[in-house]
Amino acid sequence: MVSIRPSVRHTPAYVPGEQPQTNDFIKLNTNENPYDPPAQVLAAVAAELPKVRLYPDPVSTQLRQAAADLYGVDLNQVLAGNGSDDILNIVVRTFVDPGETVAFLDLTYSLYETIASVHGAKVQKIATDANFDLTGPVICPEAKLIFLASPNPPKGKHLNREFLWQTCAQAEGVVVIDEAYGDFSDEDHWDFLQEFDNVIISRTLSKSYSLAGMRVGLAIAAPALIEEMDKVRDSYNLDRLAQVLGTAALRNQAEFVPLWEKVRHTRTRLMEQLAELDFQVCPSDANFVFAAPRWMAAADLYQALKEKKILVRYFNHPRITDYLRITVGTDGEIDQLLLAIASLKGSLG
């Protein structure tokens, strides 16, 4: 009988959003950017294709330098990962021994719990209020690591800045501020790095930079933390094409800013029109909207939209079974979504 580690055997697998195998779906379920990367970013791949027989730069120097230049930090403050999920894994493996505590909000990115549990860590869930918000700083002195996403899924609202600051000031261990959706928000936390040597900011190029298929993540922190994380990082953890596309994207950030503004504009329209269609709509600082239909069970609406070839996200979690998470797509995609919802609502009489 093959022996499986108990921490693995007893951990439910992470459930990603559905990836349809055909191209006839409107895909609003995994928070991808609806707009293609600019042409000059995609053009960067051409020169690298003949080099794919060669190993990539094992430490992603050009990508890290582009990030350092953009975010105003030194090269030795940046670690590159195979998506921000890789960064989160590296953080747990670097700073937490099995049996030690990892803390995170009771409603947040569910992969935090999966990674911590598989590692054999204890998990401490921090209670949020009825609006899925923090009620004060996270006080968990036993935690070796605290994950805090801002904006925080599934609601999509950024966390209270003062609560975050107090959390970092009081924490005994490392605090990861996960800014996966940061470019769609008016809040950032770069000044935290100047004040606290226990803070890691996690970023991804999957959302705002339209590179979900490339898997590019970044950790930005004090050099001492990055040095230890680099020991844990897998060798050649970022492929050649991902590095060159990620570098080009960061170097051409100005080309993406109008796309972020389009997402924000469409997000506002989606929130307003869902409210008109009798949804309870949560305010959002991300590229998705979290909303509950008052006239139909969310699970039933999810299935009805899927039958119309529109994918949104439903979570079978006790506190949020009334809600759907809807990625902000193009204006045309959102038009079709809203028409489908209006039709379904109208059919109920």
From Swiss-Prot:
GO terms for biological process: L-histidine biosynthetic process. Its EC number is 2.6.1.9. It catalyses: L-histidinol phosphate + 2-oxoglutarate = 3-(imidazol-4-yl)-2-oxopropyl phosphate + L-glutamate. It is an enzyme of class 2 (transferase). The modification N6-(pyridoxal phosphate)lysine is found at K207. Residues 1-22 are annotated as: Disordered. Keywords: Amino-acid biosynthesis, Aminotransferase, Histidine biosynthesis, Pyridoxal phosphate, Transferase. It comes from the Bacteria. One of its GO terms (molecular function) is histidinol-phosphate transaminase activity. Pfam families: Aminotran_1_2. Transmembrane segments: none annotated. Pathway: Amino-acid biosynthesis; L-histidine biosynthesis; L-histidine from 5-phospho-alpha-D-ribose 1-diphosphate: step 7/9. Its cofactor is pyridoxal 5'-phosphate. Belongs to the class-II pyridoxal-phosphate-dependent aminotransferase family. Histidinol-phosphate aminotransferase subfamily. PANTHER family: HISTIDINOL-PHOSPHATE AMINOTRANSFERASE, HISTIDINOL-PHOSPHATE AMINOTRANSFERASE-RELATED. Homodimer. This is Histidinol-phosphate aminotransferase. It comes from Synechocystis sp. (strain ATCC 27184 / PCC 6803 / Kazusa).
